[in-house]
Amino acid sequence: MSVISMKQLLEAGVHFGHQTRRWNPKMAPYIFTERNGIYIIDLQKTVRKAEEAYNFIKEVSTEGKDILFVGTKKQAQDAIKDEAIRSSMHFVNNRWLGGMLTNFSTIKKRIRRLSEIETMQEDGTFEVLPKKEVIKLKGELEKLEKNLGGIKNLDCDNIGAMFVVDPRKEKNAISEAKILGIPVVAIVDTNCDPEEVDYVIPGNDDAIRAVKLITAKMADAIMEGRQGEELAE
């Protein structure tokens, strides 16, 4: 039995691609037909490719490696955060800061600063500081938490794969992953270049339900890999 069914994919609208004028010809093998000026993705291929991606992610997870979830577009933010947290993984869902992986030592300093302010908030330091100072620190904390909260405990050397929603939008993240030799699994819509990705899951990257469905399956793969047992449907 496949990890994801045609019925689930259809119900979530995974088959809807972009308008025909906004396409990447390299996605032609994954396109089933064109309807009302929109490309329809071949879901049989999505089923097969999702299975390949699932097995790869499961294998990476079994080896004790981490998966970094990346999706900063509005439609992906919640699913990326929720599913990364559910599978005890790391995520970037607000903004990809340049050098997040390739210059991790600098990013680490910002993470340390985030922990510092969190400690101040927890140990009562905020209560003895001037109000103006506290407002400033809270603003800094909010910004740091937004950008770095999902990678607070990331060990850059232990990333086994990156899962991405929309490779076009996340091209900077993908190019850093490539530099470090980190394989990329991604939901790839009809306007993207599949050659940028190691494990292509052809599908709609603009519908919240479609993104949630596939992202949740990748989280399931991680959990199955860690537990070494099939997760009940």
Swiss-Prot record:
Q: Which InterPro entries match?
A: Ribosomal_uS2 (IPR001865), Ribosomal_uS2_bac/mit/plastid (IPR005706), Ribosomal_uS2_CS (IPR018130), Ribosomal_uS2_flav_dom_sf (IPR023591)
Q: Which GO terms describe its molecular function?
A: structural constituent of ribosome
Task: Point out the gene that encodes the protein.
Answer: rpsB
**Listed Pfam families:** Ribosomal_S2 (PF00318)
Which family would the database say this protein is a member of? Answer: Belongs to the universal ribosomal protein uS2 family.
- PROSITE patterns annotated for this entry? RIBOSOMAL_S2_1
Q: Looking at the keywords, is Metal-binding present? A: no
Question: What are the GO BP annotations of this UniProt entry?
Answer: translation
Can you supply one Gene Ontology CC term for this chain's record?
Answer: cytosolic small ribosomal subunit
Asked if the keyword Ribosomal protein belongs to this entry, the reply reads yes
Source organism, top-level taxon: Bacteria
**What PANTHER family does its record include?**
30S RIBOSOMAL PROTEIN S2 PROKARYOTIC AND ORGANELLAR, SMALL RIBOSOMAL SUBUNIT PROTEIN US2M
- CDD domains xrefs: RPS2 (cd01425)
- What is the name of this protein? Small ribosomal subunit protein uS2
**Mind listing the UniProt keywords for this protein, alphabetically?**
Ribonucleoprotein, Ribosomal protein
